[in-house]
Design a protein with these regions (language model features):
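N-terminal cap/lid segment of alpha/beta-hydrolase-fold proteins
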Residues: 1-16, 223
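Conserved HGGG/HGGXW glycine-rich cap/lid loop of the alpha/beta-hydrolase fold
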Residues: 11-69
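Conserved acidic catalytic loop of the alpha/beta-hydrolase fold
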Residues: 79-97
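A catalytic-pocket lid/entrance helix-loop region that shapes and gates access to the active site
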Residues: 120-169
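Short beta-strand/loop motif that positions the catalytic acidic residue
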Residues: 245-246, 252-254
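Catalytic active-site module of serine/aspartate enzymes centered on a nucleophile-bearing elbow/loop
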Residues: 277-318
């Protein structure tokens, strides 16, 4: 599916965000929010949407992907991203849209929807990340017992005195301007992500190509910036935002084997939010394109497109 429209929106403070619209120009509006933070959107993510049904909007958050300046962390925080989403909605003339995000994108989707309920027809959250210290520390250390060799290799790239404050060290490295240190950190972080299943299409990381290097440096610079500041939201505010979604159609999809975002995140959020639905992607990790995850996401989108809610979707009611 190719975009029928794309462009860059000037959101102020020196930032221009890339956006694209795919599918049916007269279809039901939906916004997809990518994860990371820092990852940017990819053509694969268009596959979530039935092109005959949805007018799907994807955009690269500040500093990510095709947005400019690439990798810029100035004026780059969660409140700015939420304002950008609203600016994009108004720019595109959309009254209400389904907001769909995965991982960090789910964090952002929930927070945006809580502040802009009237702009949302529903919320679909996949692999929920809560943005607190438990999640962040868990990402760097929680899976060490399951991938001990990969974790040891990752820790060897980090000075011993920083191994209990990995994200602070990474933020300093990516802000240092020292290209050699930055590139070593890119390779170490990327290898650890591969071990946890963030990059499912390749079991062993190939060396980055010349085209990939700038995007990887930007990705991890933005990600370290956000994680060092607990994504400028923190777990308590994310859970409060989820509680304030009461009355909106909300569905959660989470992989039972997710090593990046703990399954209990989805369970806690679901139990907090009366009327929400939760479905477990059996055997899936963090990869949204695992067959079990992809099937559930597709059925959730189809249910919302048909009914305007998730009540008849297979997920468990809260």
């Amino acid at each position: 599916m190719e975009p029928f429209d794309h462009g860059w929106l000037d959101v102020g403070q020196g930032h221009r965000v890339y956006y694209e619209q795919c599918g049916n120009p007269q279809g039901k509006p939906a916004l997809y929010l990518h994860g990371g933070p820092g990852s940017g959107c990819s053509p694969r993510q268009r596959r979530f949407f039935d092109p005959t049904v949805w007018r799907a909007v994807l955009f690269d958050q500040r500093g990510c992907g095709r947005s400019t300046p690439l990798g810029d962390t100035a004026h780059n925080h969660s409140d700015a991203l939420i304002a950008d989403i609203e600016a994009l909605r108004r720019h595109l003339g959309i009254e209400r849209w389904l907001v769909f995000g995965g991982s960090w994108g789910a964090t952002l989707a929930a927070t945006y929807a809580a502040r802009n309920r009237d702009a949302c027809s529903g919320v679909l959250l996949r692999g929920l990340f809560l943005g607190g210290r438990t999640d962040i520390d868990g990402f760097f250390h929680g899976a060490a017992a399951l991938a001990p060799e990969a974790h040891e290799a990752f820790m060897q790239a980090i000075p011993a005195r920083w191994r209990n404050r990995v994200v602070v060290w990474l933020d300093r490295v990516f802000s240092s301007g020292d290209s050699a240190r930055i590139d070593r950190a890119v390779l170490a972080w990327r290898a650890w992500e591969h071990a946890l299943g963030v990059w499912p299409e390749r079991t062993v990381p190939a060396d980055p190509t010349a085209d990939e290097w700038p995007l990887l440096r930007a990705r991890y610079r933005v990600q370290s910036h956000y994680l060092a500041h607990r994504c400028f939201i923190g777990e308590a505010k994310v859970m409060d935002a989820i509680a304030r979604l009461h009355g909106l159609p909300v569905a959660f999809v989470h992989g039972t084997n997710d090593l990046i975002c703990r399954p209990q995140n989805a369970w806690r959020a679901h139990r907090t939010l009366a009327g929400s639905r939760l479905a477990w992607a059996q055997g899936a990790g963090h990869d949204p394109f695992h067959p079990a995850s992809l099937k559930l996401l597709g059925s959730a989108l189809a249910a919302h497109a048909r009914d305007g809610h998730f009540d008849a979707w297979p997920g468990e009611p809260s």
